[in-house]
């Protein structure tokens, strides 16, 4: 059965998305169109490029997450280097290594630019801080004077997963100036709304967040907790409105509480546990899902 799929962001927690994909594929579901933000952008790009769930599972087992972080070398002490990197480079890590890793894997399937994919089969979300707008890739690239068909898919994925202060933002250079682009999760971490205006088949979403009614209330007692709650609300409120009103029955919820989004040092055991969580939750979802 053909479906469309939407995958949420969540950093390293996104390994659980691979488990969900594995069960969906085993049950005979095939994706015509996929969309995603951040970690969801990575798995969406792999699916659109023809990777099977088993192949993605193998990639997760093989990759050393620590090696995807391009370290900076300096005479400065580590702590000082980190502050300098954030202040001047706007990110602890350049992000070049993870982009190359993605590009190499896509190239192995014959995919380099969006024109190599079936038109409309992949959409990714990024955030343009310079102009204060959300970017839907590749659709909105024309706004920047860029040819969507000739834009590298790996660069678009890198834009979508540029976690603020962790990876350097992407500087999108155009004829009209330079836009600073960061993680799509800043504006829409779970773009389940993307296919609503042109729904052609069932849409299944997979999110790394809990159901709205299961979310813990935020305790705000100081400025740091206020900032955290403010950022979380900005990130999730837009998507939560869509989920609550229309889509919840079509969403697989994979709440991951014991892993940080930026923990690239996961053991094999923890990776497999995340995949198993995705599989288990998806099997439960399919037992009661009707379409």
From Swiss-Prot:
A motif (DGA/G) lies at residues 183-185. It comes from the Bacteria. It is an enzyme of class 3 (hydrolase). It is found in: Cell membrane. It is a single-pass membrane protein. A motif (GXSXG) lies at residues 36-40. Coiled coil: none annotated. Keywords: Cell membrane, Hydrolase, Lipid degradation, Lipid metabolism, Membrane, Transmembrane, Transmembrane helix. The active site is at 38 (nucleophile), 183 (proton acceptor). One of its GO terms (biological process) is lipid catabolic process. GO terms for cellular component: plasma membrane. Pfam families: Patatin (PF01734). Residues 5-196 form the PNPLA domain. GO terms for molecular function: hydrolase activity. The keyword Nucleotide-binding does not apply. Its main location: membrane. InterPro entries: Acyl_Trfase/lysoPLipase (IPR016035), Lipid_Hydrolase (IPR052580), PNPLA_dom (IPR002641). The chain crosses the membrane at residues 34-50. PROSITE patterns: PNPLA. Probable lipid hydrolase. This is Uncharacterized protein YqhO. The lineage of its organism: Bacteria, Bacillati, Bacillota, Bacilli, Bacillales.
